[in-house]
Regions:
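S-adenosylmethionine
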Residues: 1-446
């Protein structure tokens, strides 16, 4: 029996995620795997994301069936075991014997032939064993165990958001996230409908649509950037920049892959926009996206902690690199990589970027500081530290800006204030139907 292309691809991707700290979502859309048939690509994605989402639950079940501690197993062996067990427990349509056989073959293919009998024995035990019972998620320990999250993260979320919200965040992270797009052309929606793409209106923004069925990546609208794949919270953060009057200069400090840059440009079509990205390969992705637009967007490869510009900007977006804990439904590997001490390192860099960006801001200018993190160290703590050190900067209450967006028809969420915590924008996955984002609006005195 030939080895399944989908399982081989899933194994390879999971191995790269472990060894190279790659992101599964990026690998799944690499040319190598895009050559798979639609059916095989869908199964590959299901296997990869399922194993990453439920990793700790899988390991907790594998451990008692293994004669060796999991920490002693080669990564290839552990990945093969996780792949098979995920299929046993979550993919009823796949016969257990097929999943077992293919994981044994994957180990042989990975040049671990001597481990094949061990893998076979462990999986035979697991294939006949009843699934482990899981506790109701009514405590930090139970949420972490049942919903497969690190306990330290769950404990933080309970502290900051409450037990019920923490459980909802974790439930949300374990679901397949929807594909959401931003419409950039007045004809894009009707064009997609004519091609059999089914859409429904977004929950937060008038420009957003959720894709119910169909492959938008094959459409002319996608190729021409008449639509952009972008979560609604990400869209909302970008338009907090506001519609500036007259000829203005706008800076996007950490711009790749470019969705927010385009949203800002669409809102400010006459602006001169500079999009900065530190990594050359990501800057190329950014350039490819914005090059087809009619906007005046220049891309610059530079470090946002030391911006090289001499003329000030009227509007700045500082969407800084962060832990990404608001996007775990899309990037589940993050929860297994992140360590508590990482938050301090991120805080230091984020503070440096915000300082550098504020130095570029003109008097009476506006800066939006944002992350896709749920962690206080990366959000309020960064902003409040800067405010305490610079009397020329003040905080604008996000609620007033959301009310303006609501009155203009851009925001369709019924209760704008529910998107805030104090003066800050805060979306919570599972509480709102979007990723978790934070934003603060800062203004410089004249």
């Amino acid at each position: 029996m030939p080895l399944s292309s989908a399982r081989a691809a899933a194994f390879d991707i999971l191995l790269r995620v472990e060894r190279e700290s790659s992101y599964a979502s990026e690998l799944l859309h690499a040319d190598t795997y895009n050559r798979l048939s639609d059916q095989d690509h869908a199964l590959t994605m299901e296997l990869v994301m399922g194993v990453l989402r439920w990793r700790s639950r899988l390991d907790a079940e594998i451990a008692p069936a293994s004669s060796q501690p999991l920490s002693k197993l080669d990564v290839e062996i552990l990945i093969a075991l996780r792949l098979a067990l995920y299929q046993f427990r979550w993919l009823d349509r796949i016969p257990k014997r097929a999943a077992l056989h293919e994981s044994v073959e994957l180990v042989k293919r990975a040049r671990k032939r001597s481990a094949a009998p061990f893998v076979n024995a462990v999986l035979r035990k697991l294939s006949t064993a009843a699934p482990q019972s899981t506790p109701e998620p009514d405590s930090a320990e139970a949420i972490a165990s049942t919903l497969a999250h690190p306990a330290w993260l769950v404990e933080r979320w309970i502290h900051h958001y409450g037990l019920a919200a923490a459980a909802e965040i974790c439930r949300h992270n374990q679901r397949i996230p929807p594909t959401t797009i931003r419409l950039r052309s007045p004809t894009a929606e009707s064009e997609l409908n004519a091609q059999g793409i089914k859409l429904k209106p977004g929950s937060l923004l008038a420009s957003a649509r959720r894709v119910l069925s169909g492959d938008i990546t094959t459409t002319r609208a996608f190729r021409q950037a008449d639509i952009v794949i972008q979560d609604e919270a990400s869209q909302l953060v970008a338009i907090l920049i506001g519609r500036a009057q007259g000829e203005v200069r706008i800076l996007d400090c950490c711009a790749a892959p470019g969705g927010k840059t385009l949203a800002i440009a669409d809102q400010n079509p006459t602006a001169e926009i500079t999009a900065v990205e530190i990594h050359p390969h990501r800057a190329r992705l950014l350039q490819n996206l914005v090059s087809g637009s009619k906007h005046n967007i220049g891309t610059v490869v530079a470090d946002a902690t030391n911006l090289p510009f001499t003329s000030p900007y009227h509007r700045i977006l500082a969407d800084v690199p962060c832990s990404g804990t608001g996007t775990l439904s899309r990037n589940p590997e993050i929860k297994w990589r992140l360590k508590p001490e990482d938050l301090s390192d991120l805080h230091t860099r984020q503070r440096a970027i915000l300082r550098s960006a504020l130095a570029q801001l003109s008097p009476d200018g506006r800066l939006v500081y944002s992350t896709c993190s749920l962690e206080k160290e990366e959000n309020e703590d960064v902003v409040e530290e800067i405010l305490a050190q610079d009397n020329s900067i003040h905080l604008l209450d996000c609620r007033s800006e959301l009310d303006l967006l609501k009155n203009a028809g851009d925001l369709v969420w019924p209760v704008p204030a529910s998107l805030t915590r104090g003066p800050y924008l805060r979306t919570i996955p599972g509480i709102q139907p979007c990723d978790g984002f934070f934003a603060a609006i800062l203004e410089k005195d004249s």
